[in-house]
């Protein structure tokens, strides 16, 4: 790897007006504008590093401001020194003695960290001419473990245990890499038909289309009312059937108390969902445990993680047996490094990884992480959410074929956005360039659509 120095950075506030057609609508977030708090690391080479954090509109500018503070700590640093001891670099980035006060390791500052750390990985991958997943797949167990800051999680897993676990997976790794290169490492599931704001006709149409496209796992948003959800799940089962190998999942996006979640899901149990996602507050470890215990006799699992702020919270969810499914988020956690730590804990305690991927840029990110989990860590096929929106704005968008993610082969982390898309949807943007300066944007800007 030739010597590369980070010379500067930029953040960009990019917002797509998805609230206009209710894409992404759920019981908690009725009308979000899918957004990227975007980070670009500039260098003295031909390469730049691109990372982003997903939000749903207002407040995206706050994350961009935080990105500037975190990225400033990289200015003047040589890439080779940053990646030589990734665990040390990660701790350096989270340990600014003043910035950590507004975390620590959670909230806006941690969202910003995710964007910046992922931009470093993107830059590193480009200099090596590899996709991010392949960098990790080519690591030795010791190199993988050196990417992680084990502070706060050694009661769950030690570096020595992690190396031993990864070494056990080495035997079949070459075969799994070959499967990845044949696009058979990451089966996809779809949420495209399940948004809460969609009408019956649109829901039926999208279910039929995704079924015909090879999907066998389908997620539906719930939490509006029991009656309406029973009607919508009835529509889903009418099309998918109960005994055709089609799996149904439901997602409440945190709207219920613990007793409400238990009662509500008992009333939906006849539709045989695999799991209920985010049934209550994402911070309530004991609440998730109570819900899981209550729903186990009904064959319904509990999934959460898209709002889980760091590896410490995941440690608690996993070690207490509060979840059946671990839903890592590529940029709510502190980038690739913290995800690698959670993959190890999930493997040790037998909890499958099903990443959160319902947002702009998230499928592009998580296809790498699910591939890493299968090839390097768990050795077991899982599924990964795919939301078929906004991929046209990326240089190397994620692609689904025959129900599988097509494993990325281009160098980088797949979230580099087209310059024209960033210009068109930058907020507040330049007059005559940004969509947000047009009359079309007024219903959102005036609060009529949100």
Swiss-Prot record:
Its cofactor is Mg(2+). Its EC number is 4.2.1.146. The keyword Mitochondrion does not apply. GO terms for biological process: amino acid catabolic process; D-galacturonate catabolic process. Divalent metal ions. Magnesium seems to be the preferred ion. One of its GO terms (molecular function) is L-fuconate dehydratase activity. Mg(2+) binds at residues 251, 277, 306. InterPro entries: Enolase-like_C_sf, Enolase-like_N, Enolase_C-like, L-fuconate_dehydratase, Mandel_Rmase/mucon_lact_enz_CS, Mandelate_racemase_C, RHMD-like. Gene3D superfamilies: Enolase-like C-terminal domain, Enolase-like, N-terminal domain. The active site is at 221, 356. It holds the Pfam family MR_MLE_C. Pathway: Carbohydrate acid metabolism. Belongs to the mandelate racemase/muconate lactonizing enzyme family. Mediates the conversion of L-galactonate to 2-dehydro-3-deoxy-L-galactonate, the second step in D-galacturonate catabolic process. This is L-galactonate dehydratase. It comes from Hypocrea jecorina (Trichoderma reesei).
């Amino acid at each position: 790897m030739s010597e590369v120095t980070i010379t500067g950075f930029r953040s960009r506030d990019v917002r797509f007006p998805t609230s206009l057609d209710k894409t992404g609508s759920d019981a908690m977030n009725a009308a979000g504008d899918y957004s990227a708090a975007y980070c670009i690391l500039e260098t003295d080479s031909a390469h730049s590093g691109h990372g982003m954090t997903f939000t749903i509109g207002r407040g995206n500018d706050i994350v961009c401001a935080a990105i500037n503070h975190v990225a400033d700590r990289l200015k003047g640093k040589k890439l080779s020194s940053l990646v030589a001891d990734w665990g040390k670099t990660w701790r350096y980035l989270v340990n600014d003695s003043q910035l950590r006060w507004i975390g620590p390791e959670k909230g806006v500052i941690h969202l910003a960290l995710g964007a910046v750390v992922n931009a470093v990985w993107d830059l590193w991958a480009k200099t090596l001419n590899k996709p991010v997943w392949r960098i990790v797949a080519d690591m030795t167990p010791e190199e993988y473990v050196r990417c992680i800051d084990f502070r706060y999680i050694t009661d769950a897993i030690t570096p020595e245990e992690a190396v031993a676990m990864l070494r056990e997976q080495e035997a079949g790794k070459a075969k799994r890499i070959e499967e990845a290169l044949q696009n058979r490492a990451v089966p996809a599931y779809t949420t495209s038909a399940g948004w809460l704001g969609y009408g019956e006709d649109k829901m039926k149409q999208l279910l039929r289309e995704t079924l015909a496209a090879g999907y066998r796992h389908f997620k539906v948003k719930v939490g509006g009312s029991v009656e309406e959800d029973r009607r919508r799940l009835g529509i889903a089962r009418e099309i998918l059937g109960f005994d055709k190998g089609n799996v149904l999942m439901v997602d409440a996006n945190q709207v219920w108390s613990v007793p409400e979640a238990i009662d509500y899901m008992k009333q939906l149990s006849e539709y045989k969902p695999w799991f209920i996602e985010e049934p209550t507050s994402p911070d309530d470890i004991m609440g998730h445990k109570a819900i899981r215990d209550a729903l186990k006799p009904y064959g319904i699992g509990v999934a959460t993680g898209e709002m889980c702020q760091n590896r410490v919270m995941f440690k608690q969810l996993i070690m207490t047996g509060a979840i059946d499914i671990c839903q890592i988020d590529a940029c709510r956690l502190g980038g690739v490094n913290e995800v690698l730590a959670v993959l190890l804990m999930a493997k040790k305690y037998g909890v499958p990884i099903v990443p959160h991927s319902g947002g702009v840029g998230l499928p592009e990110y998580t296809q790498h992480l699910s591939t890493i989990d299968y090839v390097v860590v768990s050795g077991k096929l899982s599924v990964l959410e795919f939301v078929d929106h906004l991929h046209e704005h990326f240089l190397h968008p994620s692609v689904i074929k025959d129900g599988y993610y097509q494993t990325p082969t281009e160098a980088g982390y797949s979230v580099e956005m087209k310059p024209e898309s960033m210009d068109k949807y930058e907020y507040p943007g330049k007059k005559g360039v940004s969509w947000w300066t047009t009359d079309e944007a007024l219903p959102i800007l005036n609060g009529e659509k949100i």
